[in-house]
Amino acid sequence: GVGKYSPDSKVNEAIAKGFKVYVPEKNQNAFSDFSISGNIESALDESDLVIDASPGGQGFKNKKLFYESRDILSIYQGGEAIDGENAVSNLLFNSKVNYNDAIGKKHVMQGSCNVTGMGRILEPLRKNFENSIKRFDVTLVRRWADIEQTGETIPDTIELTQNPHHGEDVKSYFGKNTPLFVRAIKVPTRQMHLHIMDVRFNGNAPSVDDIHDIFKNEYGIATLWSVKGTKDIRDFAEKLNFSFKDTNMIHIHANMTQKIDDTIQIMYSDDQTGIVIPENHMLLQAMLFEKSYEGAAKHTEKLFNMSEKKRLLESNFAKK
């Protein structure tokens, strides 16, 4: 079922898709025009696992108020903390990096879309070139709002993000001494995040072809050559009726990859919320069913068809 706090059109959308909708007991009167199935509190009593998608900071309150007392397995989203007195967990999940660490855990935080995307690119680089990499410098160009957030005004400005959390979040699963430096800005668009990553090597950097080759068979990463802008990808996803226009993956803009002496520059776009949803499915299979990584990935592929999406994207945006 789905927990809903605000009485809006999303309630009927969920019901139409066959979900039971539960609302806070104190707010039930506000939902009198909807066919709700009961209150959230009673639904939690019958739940094995909760995916908490509440605003940042509320997840920790929910953990203390609802989940711990009921001994419910809980997954929290990127707005929460893994350090300090308000930490929801000591594990930030990225299926490519630490899938097995989530098995047996009761409370785990799923990384944000930007953190998930960085991990998906960094892990293959680290696996193939770990001993020769000197440092990673990443500029996050973040979208302002998601596609479905049509009510949110997008201002005519570029917002500067001081001390972004993304770098420390990534270091939580790669190690505190990881030579990763992150800066972030927010731009007025709904059409995906874009990351510009400079990878510095000890000595001469690998060739551009060598870099592209390591991502060729990576799950959830498409290598595209002829994209002019991120909206091209979203429009293609809509044309092919991908659910919610999501590709669920990272798109390396291969025509933008460059090598200069000891440095490789990679540019890739990140499917914002679309990249995190399959990760949540991977995580719940680790926590609830203790599946192997291979088993969880196989089931997730059945749901999201990411291999076929990758094939279609790479074919449409192939090298001219």
Where do the language-model regions lie?
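N-terminal Rossmann-like NAD(P) cofactor-binding subdomain of oxidoreductases
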Residues: 1-148, 295-299
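Structural alpha-beta junctions
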Residues: 69-71, 130-134, 176-179, 221-223, ...
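Active-site catalytic microenvironments for nucleophilic, acid-base chemistry
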Residues: 124-128, 200, 286
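A generic structural signal for alpha-helix starts
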Residues: 116, 203-206, 275
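NAD(P)-dependent Rossmann-like dehydrogenase/reductase catalytic/cofactor-binding core
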Residues: 245-320
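Buried hydrophobic packing segments
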Residues: 118-125, 170, 280-284
